[in-house]
Amino acid sequence: MAHFAKLGSNSKVIQVLTLNNGDMLNADGKEDESVGQQYLERHNNWPAQMWIQTSYNTGGGKHKLGGTPLRGNYAGIGYTWDEDNNIFYGKKPHASWVLNTTTASWHSPIGDAPELTDEEKSADSHYEWNEDGKSWDLTNSLA
C-alpha cells in the first residue's frame, strides 16, 4: 500500500489516504507518484498536485526498516508540507525551537536535553523544556 497526504491550500495535511500500489503503475509497470496523484484526483475530486506521497516507515529523516527515507516523516493530519525541502514536519513545540530540515524535526535552540544519570533515572526524573528560561529543567515525576 502507498500512502498519500492530501494538502489544503496552506500546505497543511488535511487527510492521509492509502492507495493500492497497482493503482500507481506507469506504462512500464513501475510505481510512479504522478500516476497515483492522477488516480487520487479522479477519484477524490482534489487536484493531483495537492496529493503528496508519504512513507509510513519514515520518521525523523530515517527509514525504520533501513531503506531510503521519504520526505522526512510520515505525514499526519496537521503536519506541514515543505515543498522547498521536500519534507513533512509536525507542529512547532515551542516558539524558540528551530526546524532541522535534514531530520525534519524540531530542536531546542540549545540542543538536546542532557543525559540522565543513573541516580536521576532511578528517581524517575526527566528533563522538560523551559521556554521562558530557554533551558532544560530537571523534574521528578513522583513529586
List each language-model region with its residue ranges:
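Interaction-interface detector
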Residues: 1-143
